[in-house]
Amino acid sequence: MIRLGAPQTLVLLTLLVAAVLRCHGQDVQKAGSCVQDGQRYNDKDVWKPEPCRICVCDTGTVLCDDIICEDMKDCLSPETPFGECCPICSADLPTASGQPGPKGQKGEPGDIKDIVGPKGPPGPQGPAGEQGPRGDRGDKGEKGAPGPRGRDGEPGTPGNPGPPGPPGPPGPPGLGGNFAAQMAGGFDEKAGGAQMGVMQGPMGPMGPRGPPGPAGAPGPQGFQGNPGEPGEPGVSGPMGPRGPPGPPGKPGDDGEAGKPGKSGERGPPGPQGARGFPGTPGLPGVKGHRGYPGLDGAKGEAGAPGVKGESGSPGENGSPGPMGPRGLPGERGRTGPAGAAGARGNDGQPGPAGPPGPVGPAGGPGFPGAPGAKGEAGPTGARGPEGAQGPRGEPGTPGSPGPAGAAGNPGTDGIPGAKGSAGAPGIAGAPGFPGPRGPPGPQGATGPLGPKGQTGEPGIAGFKGEQGPKGEPGPAGPQGAPGPAGEEGKRGARGEPGGAGPAGPPGERGAPGNRGFPGQDGLAGPKGAPGERGPSGLAGPKGANGDPGRPGEPGLPGARGLTGRPGDAGPQGKVGPSGAPGEDGRPGPPGPQGARGQPGVMGFPGPKGANGEPGKAGEKGLPGAPGLRGLPGKDGETGAAGPPGPAGPAGERGEQGAPGPSGFQGLPGPPGPPGEGGKPGDQGVPGEAGAPGLVGPRGERGFPGERGSPGSQGLQGARGLPGTPGTDGPKGAAGPAGPPGAQGPPGLQGMPGERGAAGIAGPKGDRGDVGEKGPEGAPGKDGGRGLTGPIGPPGPAGANGEKGEVGPPGPAGTAGARGAPGERGETGPPGPAGFAGPPGADGQPGAKGEQGEAGQKGDAGAPGPQGPSGAPGPQGPTGVTGPKGARGAQGPPGATGFPGAAGRVGPPGSNGNPGPPGPPGPSGKDGPKGARGDSGPPGRAGDPGLQGPAGPPGEKGEPGDDGPSGPDGPPGPQGLAGQRGIVGLPGQRGERGFPGLPGPSGEPGKQGAPGASGDRGPPGPVGPPGLTGPAGEPGREGSPGADGPPGRDGAAGVKGDRGETGAVGAPGAPGPPGSPGPAGPIGKQGDRGEAGAQGPMGPAGPAGARGMPGPQGPRGDKGETGEAGERGLKGHRGFTGLQGLPGPPGPSGDQGASGPAGPSGPRGPPGPVGPSGKDGANGIPGPIGPPGPRGRSGETGPAGPPGNPGPPGPPGPPGPGIDMSAFAGLGQREKGPDPLQYMRADEAAGNLRQHDAEVDATLKSLNNQIESLRSPEGSRKNPARTCRDLKLCHPEWKSGDYWIDPNQGCTLDAMKVFCNMETGETCVYPNPASVPKKNWWSSKSKDKKHIWFGETINGGFHFSYGDDNLAPNTANVQMTFLRLLSTEGSQNITYHCKNSIAYLDEAAGNLKKALLIQGSNDVEIRAEGNSRFTYTVLKDGCTKHTGKWGKTMIEYRSQKTSRLPIIDIAPMDIGGPEQEFGVDIGPVCFL
């Protein structure tokens, strides 16, 4: 045996270690690491815990072995290197290098028997052995982690067999040499190669070629060969063990829907889509009307008995039947398209084993089963690409030696090539048995390592030689007896999926799962094969000869031809009615791979199979298609909110909103009446003295000065310039009323008034010419329901009314009687797929339908059982065509053939041409209100038509979509007063008017702006008090001032009346499917549908058993139409047909019970702003606001009471004089000058420090009180006198509710009002704010007169104002003060009428029936007459009796504040039984 030299061995060892490390690197993640002596080793690590021991980590287990050293007898000076176990020979040996000798013959087998060497370390990897016999089936892998859910893949073609797994663990101990000793001991590069073992003799002459030795052990791994040609595909091998989990699938389908999003806005209808594939069958509809009988179809030829059709799509699970007997295995069906995964059902009982489906993608590993018995060897699979070294196989028994071949010329083997680069070392195979012993060769010269020599006397096992060239394969020996089982190898890495295994027996039928959710619509399934032929019917009357059919009718029977090619797809047939559910069919072909079930019951072990032959290597297959869709993932996170839904209906009236932001300045109003004089202002702070002016005219009388020494009488000075106006003085006592002045010039236009309360809608007038679009009025409040009046005689038919508003949906009425059947409508487009209903009970058998068109010729069925047949004779030659035979009698029907293979799924047909329009259907129920259309372009106004005769009133139509806006019409009547507009921008300045007549002397004007301070003049001498001068003339009117800055935004208007009901919202998201209802009663047989389209031809089925050979006749002439056979017995129930396309929608069923409320939709986007609501109720007082900013320092208060006298102090130094002006004002009642004004900054501290702390506190308190008097907050604790005061003190504040106390004094009687901070108006709310709408007054008298509501009508009342919580007369007292403090008042009221005239009597054309209004000073305010006592009408909707509610809005403004507020109203046109009214009272506003 030849020893390896150190360098070669070192190379091998290096490669071996590299391979071990590489494998180790590959497996670190896969297998567990090991711990020994506290040191952690990765899987496949090799280490030496001590010099003579070597260990390896194998998947978490430490395997150790002792190193056995080789005997070094022949070494003169063996040395053991430090840290090593075995000695090495250190003598340098010469290395002769000769030419390689010729290759020796194979030696004889040695006869070492059963000598087991010590366990060698893993040898270098041998070349790939020939494919060994198939190993036993491995244990089932452990369950892998579930992969992410993939999308439904298309069913892939089965992948090629996967590559072999990674190398297995080291094999059992080998026979033969001790390679470990060398490995463990290391190699000395200087050692010679040849002399490491037995001394080598000289090379003998080449012997004759020996007989082929027994098969050697697999050699080390060879280099990778070039890929061979792809082999023929082998027969499918048995199903391999489950492969490792596949790569993560494509992202899974989205998780189950989050909670339904809130409904989005309804999109515009899309275009009509192409015809969809049939949806899941809907729930059974109400039975339709019987259809019209179809036309007689042309009689089809009798088809050959069709092959039994493929099972139809599985029906919904029926209620579980009794467990049937185990069925025969069905034929293997083609894989159907994958359905969508249903929701997981409850675990059923284990069913009988179903036929195996095609190999699905790798599922998650199942639970490990018990190991099955070893199966028989499957047929050879296609050869996979060369894999990594497999686990060690069992050693085969040696074959018997073949006969010796003739000695070949040495040239057969060729010169050994240069040594190739080392292959990746494999783990050593088991050592082979020793070859037969060769004769000893003569001693050769020491050449380079020669080929293998003869085996010498059995010596100590040598090292393994280098791989020689591969010998030619010997003939296969007989199969040896199975060797003993090797140690169990390490589990290999998971192989790729094997080819499809042979079909297993069908599983037991599982219990039905829960109903899944409807899957996505599948593609249209293939047309099923024709069902079994029913027995013959009773003889019918002879039909007329039909037109020639598409295929020729059969002549005399020829020999059965081969199956023809598929024909073209027939035209799309119309949808037939669904048949009655069939009985359970035979087990269908396997469906697509289902979701993985729970592990089944363990099967019995199968018998062991025979070993297959090795197949050729196939090319690596493409990756398989992604697997089926997995089970639904966990619920996804809630999705983002959906898009905003459509606007919801208008909400209930909200609470009073916060005041809106200020608007822009409005345009100036028309000139108002002249204002009354302003109130006297408070006294202002005196300015500093001006420069001495020219001597002015005698001034007004001043306050008496301190008495001076009497001076001499001065001369009267000239009239001085007017001084700057002082600040407002305190309020003077009211003087006697002066005579009314002459009418002044018209004032500037006032701001627009507050928006009045919304009026009631007037009755619909006659349709006028189209007006220009008027301003939109505020919607009125809905009236209370009136009493039902007696039915009047029918009036002349009015013009068609405008379309009314959509009423709220009424409650569902009871179901009406069934109407007469309408004419058959056009088939509607298929409705959306409903949820699958439970199968109905079996219906009564329908009448026999007309014979359908002939289907494509089915594949040949197996011949029916005829009588016992004789042995088939040889086939005769084709005979001559015989004459046409006489018509034979109809033969008995043949037995049912087997099902043909299913045809392919046809492509969806193109959309058919639209059919002709059907006759108009009966009118449908009112649909929901359509979405608002886009505004169309304005049409041009048509000429007014002649007035037609009035038609009868139409029924209330369904609200149409909003039409396009028409062109602007002529201006309509005056709309309701709008909300008070925002103050407009100032208009252009008008020209100066002529001076008016002198007015009465006004009250002092408002405080002017203080003038600029003049320089301080020298004090004049104190003069004596002068006499009172005559009153000066009034100055002439000043020129208009510069334009003021724009005013602030107007107050938010009073909330308008409740808007009309909004349009019906978009339908909510569909509720979850209801639980299935109970099965309905058996419906009547539906009418026969029209023939379905001919499906495409299925692929050719396997050829049937050969029929009895007949003489092959040429095709016979067309036979005559056969007579109808007798009516046969009822056939077996056919298999369930394929699912038909959806039928036309049935008539709507009765309204179902309301489903459970769906989940609330998402909050819709804010709806369009509704019309203003009604006046809100007074809000509750807000919380006390935060403390205001610190007020200004108050002026010094009056001196406090004198303190107790202190003890006399020591005399101080003479002090400076005190500035007496600091205390000059303390004793006066009016405000004196601000002492702090005269202090210098450096004096203040010194002077103030002397004040007593008590005085300081008092001053501070007084200061705060004075500040609150000077600048009230409008809170309950610190009310203002009027809103105008608040506006002056806090111009930045917004309009809203504030507290005022016009009579000042105690604040407990303050009242809450609305302050319009744009105008300064104070508005007091009425209480109550409305008079209910009803019939208040009945009178038989024909004479109509005004009836005062508060005074005369039973239940009437005078209108009152202010808070509920004020004492009864408090509001009146406060109102009296408020009138005195104001110069103008205004108020709106709205009169709601039904058959009552409010202002203009349209019939009479006059105002005689107009309302009267009573002011608070009992003055009557009328519709006509003196303009001071007349009201204005903003909108008049009560001009005639229409039987509907209308409203008239009235406004009264006056500068005589004593006339407001309005306290009573007197309608005239009331008293009849159908005459009703109500009143909305607006707030009264004073300015």
Swiss-Prot record:
Residues 26-181 form a propeptide. Its main location: secreted. Residues 105-116, 133-154, 251-265, 764-775, 1115-1129 have a biased composition (Basic and acidic residues). Residues 192-203, 218-239, 310-320, 335-350, 370-382, 391-431, 622-631, 656-667, 721-736, 833-848, 877-913, 1091-1109, 1148-1157 have a biased composition (Low complexity). The keyword Transit peptide does not apply. Residues 201-1214 are annotated as: Triple-helical region. Ca(2+) binds at D1301, N1303, Q1304, C1306, D1309. Residues 1-25 form the signal peptide. One of its GO terms (molecular function) is extracellular matrix structural constituent conferring tensile strength. Residues 1253-1487 form the Fibrillar collagen NC1 domain. The modification 4-hydroxyproline is found at P908, P914, P920, P1181, P1187, P1202, P1205, P1208, P1211, P1214. The modification 5-hydroxylysine is found at K190, K287, K299, K308, K374, K419, K452, K464, K470, K527, K542, K608, K620, K1130. Belongs to the fibrillar collagen family. Type II collagen is specific for cartilaginous tissues. It is essential for the normal embryonic development of the skeleton, for linear growth and for the ability of cartilage to resist compressive forces. This is Collagen alpha-1(II) chain. It comes from Bos taurus (Bovine). The gene is COL2A1.
